Amino acid sequence: LFSGSSYAKNIPPGSGIGDVPANILILLDKSGSMSVRMTSGSGFMYPYSAAADSSGDVYVGSYWTYGIKKLTYATGAVDTSFASSGTYTGSGNCRSYYPMNIKIHNGYMYVASYYQHRVFRVNLSTGACDWNHYIRYARNIAIGNNILYATGYYGNAVIRNLSTNSNISC
């Protein structure tokens, strides 16, 4: 019923070495470009939101690791000089805790932090968080005509004039 011998199949046609027996689980690509583990220190686990700045750099919010990472346009790699070893987690009212939405506008990163119940702003040049606002289960951000619109569950919202840095009452 059981045999101690194992047998290998030949490499699929077109691989160039069809006469050498081998055990192949899956062949994705020969260049090795797919060997990066996305849950390693330089990868992502459950990326939820992404935004690009004017230089083409991309900021990705990962809700499992509660952080935001920056990928540089030139290399496509995580920029380890961004925030703390390449990941912004923040603290206090500017903590990135399940970042549900990210927007980049005029050198600032705006984040809707779902379980922190905050929308906050980080200066991308200095890394300082200089504004935050309570929104229960902050979820969505939109920016148009220098006006920030942020919403959460249960009718929570904030509208902010980014030119004057003041909230607008409706």
Labelled PLM ranges:
Residues 66-70, 117-120, 155-158:
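A short loop-to-beta-strand structural motif that recurs across blades of beta-propeller domains
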